[in-house]
């Protein structure tokens, strides 16, 4: 497994070279937790032993574990625990473990065996939802529905795009019945961000303008909660997604106007994604900015915008070196050379 830069990161993982809307996916997954050190007490009663051996920590601790590339280690614990915990005798704990299993499989899908791991994630989330009903556990229900929607959206990038996106929309709609802006602002914002990404993905196969406009509306809803002052990383994620969406919309109408909006959105993201704090997010966003300036050069101020594009690509290459990120290095270098030739 590749080592990550020893810099502070946002937790945002990119989906390889897939859709640009796969930004903030992992942070959009809700409700993960990690099991701490397993201490074995021999009391003769197996269930008592398991219950006393389990130590659940916070979502932040789970994120830190996964940030250390310990996804498979976490999954091993979840799987062992779920095989011992009774869904009947301790339903809530069982559902928590299944939800966390789903998060692990989702994250593993970013690394390997994409389709197989996404299908395992879906199965785990569906198992959790047998217990996490809207009536008994409304918040947990919404969390897992959001996770399920995100996973179906990811699966749509692999196969059966329309079919899986339909399932994603259904899951997000269920989550938003619980996650209202007034009562659950963070869940509302996360789900709106994910909903926007789903509409953007759908725009690739049908009703491009209409679905991109729906995506923009959803991202703007998310930004009503995800302000830079209160939730800077969520703000940056959604602004970057918004910038990508405006760039896509520029291919349909008002090219100059929508590209200008894209520039502004991406620049907002870069107020948070700095080179020192979030190098990978910085590089990805600088690459996006370079692409926007390259497109804008086709409309106005050709030399000026191409120069800005080259500078943005050069910034991205401060992170995307040939030795550490060869595929990104080659892609960004090719875009930069093209911009230089067009000047």
Named regions from a protein language model:
Residues 47-49, 82-94, 111, 129-141, ...:
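Flexible helix-coil transition and linker loops at the boundaries of alpha-helical arrays
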Residues 59-67, 93-110, 139-154, 186-204, ...:
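Conserved alpha-helical positions within TPR/SEL1-like repeat arrays
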Residues 62-73, 106-119, 153-167, 200-214, ...:
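Short coil/turn connectors between adjacent alpha-helices in alpha-solenoid helical repeat scaffolds
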Residues 317-320, 324-343:
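Leucine-rich solenoid repeat scaffolds
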């Amino acid at each position: 497994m590749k080592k990550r830069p020893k810099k502070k990161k946002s937790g945002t993982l990119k989906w390889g070279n897939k859709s640009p809307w796969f930004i903030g996916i992992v942070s959009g997954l809700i409700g993960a937790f990690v099991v701490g050190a397993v201490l074995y007490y021999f009391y003769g009663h197996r269930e008592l032993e398991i219950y006393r051996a389990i130590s659940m920590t916070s979502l932040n601790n789970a994120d830190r574990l996964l940030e250390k590339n310990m996804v498979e280690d976490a999954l091993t614990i979840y799987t062992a625990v779920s095989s011992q915990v009774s869904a009947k005798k301790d339903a809530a704990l069982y559902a928590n473990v299944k939800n966390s299993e789903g998060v692990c499989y989702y994250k593993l899908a970013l690394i390997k065996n994409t389709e197989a791991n996404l299908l395992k994630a879906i199965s785990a989330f569906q198992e959790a939802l047998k217990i996490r009903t809207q009536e008994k556990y409304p918040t947990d229900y919404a969390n897992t529905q959001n996770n399920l929607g995100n996973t179906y959206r990811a699966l749509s990038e692999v196969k059966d795009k329309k079919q899986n996106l339909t399932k994603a929309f259904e899951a997000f709609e269920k989550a938003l019945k619980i996650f209202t802006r007034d009562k659950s602002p963070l869940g509302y914002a996360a789900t709106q961000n994910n909903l926007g990404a789903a509409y953007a993905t759908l725009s690739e196969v049908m009703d491009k303008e209409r679905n991109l406009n729906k995506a923009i509306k959803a991202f703007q809803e998310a930004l009503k909660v995800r302000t830079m002052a209160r939730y800077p990383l969520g703000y940056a994620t959604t602004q970057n997604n918004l910038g990508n969406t405006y760039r896509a919309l520029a291919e349909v109408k008002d090219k100059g106007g929508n590209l200008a909006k894209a520039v502004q959105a991406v620049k907002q993201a870069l107020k948070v994604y700095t080179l020192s704090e979030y190098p990978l997010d910085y590089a990805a966003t600088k690459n996006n900015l370079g692409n926007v300036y390259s497109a804008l050069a086709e409309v106005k101020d050709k030399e000026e915008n191409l120069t800005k594009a080259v500078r943005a690509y050069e910034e991205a290459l401060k992170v995307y070196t040939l030795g550490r990120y060869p595929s990104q290095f080659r892609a960004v270098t090719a875009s930069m050379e093209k911009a230089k030739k067009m000047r």
